[in-house]
């Protein structure tokens, strides 16, 4: 497992312990609220994260602090890659593979996942080098 995968796994494991719940139907919503010992009209006591995912409202500050810390750790790992051939390359290679670039050829999906734009990549030699190296696998 490379550096990017280790950090991604570490962040996923921490996120998984956060206590979020999913409810995409009324029945599941009621069940979720019951599991939290809340009435179905206690809407002010929950926070909607999107994609049918909820957390308790009291956990919102801790959740966003965790997400911000994850973002900073990722940015630090990018900054510490002096050439773009380490963490940055691993990051692009992993996400290209994960998002089926070989078949879809949708770089925008990969960049959205990484919260990057083509402008950022083109203006940063390390990012450009890492992406170019990762894309070589898909050249025909």
Give residue ranges: language-model regions.
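Soluble, non-transmembrane alpha-helical interaction regions
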Residues: 1-140
């Amino acid at each position: 497992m490379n550096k990017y995968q280790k950090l991604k796994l570490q962040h996923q494991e921490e996120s998984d312990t956060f206590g979020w719940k999913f409810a995409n139907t009324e029945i599941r919503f009621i069940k979720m609220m019951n599991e939290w010992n809340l009435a179905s009209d206690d809407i002010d006591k929950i926070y909607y994260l999107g994609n049918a995912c909820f957390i308790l409202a009291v956990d919102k500050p801790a959740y966003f602090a965790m997400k911000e810390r994850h973002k900073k750790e990722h940015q630090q790992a990018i900054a510490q890659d002096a050439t773009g051939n380490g963490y940055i390359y691993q990051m692009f290679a992993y996400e290209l593979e994960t998002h089926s670039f070989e078949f879809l050829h949708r770089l925008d999906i990969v960049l959205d996942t990484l919260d990057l734009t083509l402008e950022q990549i083109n203006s940063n030699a390390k990012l450009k080098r890492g992406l170019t190296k990762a894309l070589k696998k898909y050249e025909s």
